[in-house]
Each structure stands twice: as structure tokens, then as C-alpha cells.
Amino acid sequence: MSLLEGIIDSRNNPLAVVEDIAASNNWPFERSGEDELTIVSKGQWTDYQISFTWMGEIEALHLACAFDMKIPVARRPEVQRLVAAINEQLWVGHFDLWTHTGMIMHRQALVLPGGLTASTAQCEAMLAGAIHASERYFPAFQFVVWAGKSTTEAMSAAMFDTEGEA
């Protein structure tokens, strides 16, 4: 790769946009490599580890928003049913249960073919969408994992929106 190609590649790397967003919001972040950046965001229920990865080979910016909840093996079948029920409600992104770690995460990707660049608005929308979905459904995961509730019970509780704060 020539020096010029390296400069063009670094300008088109959407992680620079994500890094600017994190810095402007005073969110702690870490670049673990030239193609990965992780932000820590405090939520109402838990802290979120939000990893953005630039996947040059498929020209996509991948987001994975994980929270600290390890799913016990005995509860995984019900959690998988809950993930399916939640994903039916989502228009953008999806939740996954990573079976090898037992972790839940919200994932989505922004495809940027042919050298397109990500805008600040696109990256902010990805970030906001992941946090919103995680905040909305975190209690449902808690109900299933720690309270032993069914998917139906957890979804009923998650779909109940309250007004204001107590």
C-alpha cells in the first residue's frame, strides 16, 4: 500500500468519527487497534461496553453493545426465546446470546461500500439506538435470568412504559 492509499484509508475509517463523538461527550474510550474502538457508557441499569469495529474486507462498521450479565446455562433456553421475542420488536439492530461466553449484546452494522464515509449523524444514531434498545430490554433480561420469569412475563413488563420518575 502506498502512503497516499494509507492516508485515504485513515480518512475513510469511520472510527475517527466515533472517536470524535466519544471525545465530545467526555465518554471514556479506548482504541485497541486501528480497526477497533470501545466506549464505556453509563446507563440507567448498568454500564455498557460499546465496541465499534471497522471491517474493511466487507466495508462495514460493526457495533456491539454488551452489558455485564452472564447468562447461566440453565436459563439460556428461556433467554434465547426472549431474544427472539425482542428481535421481533426491533426495526434496527438485533440482540444475540453468545453461547461461548453467555453474554448478551445488541449488534448492528453500517455498510459503507465503495469508499463511502460515515457521518456523525449515522454513528450517533447507531450508538443511540444500541443504548436505547439495551436500556429498554435490560429489565426483561433481568426478569428471565434472575427472577426466573418466562419470556411472556418479561416482555409484558418491558413493554410497560412509565411516565416520569419516582
Set out the residue ranges of the language-model regions.
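Short, internal acidic amphipathic alpha-helical interface segments
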Residues: 66-103
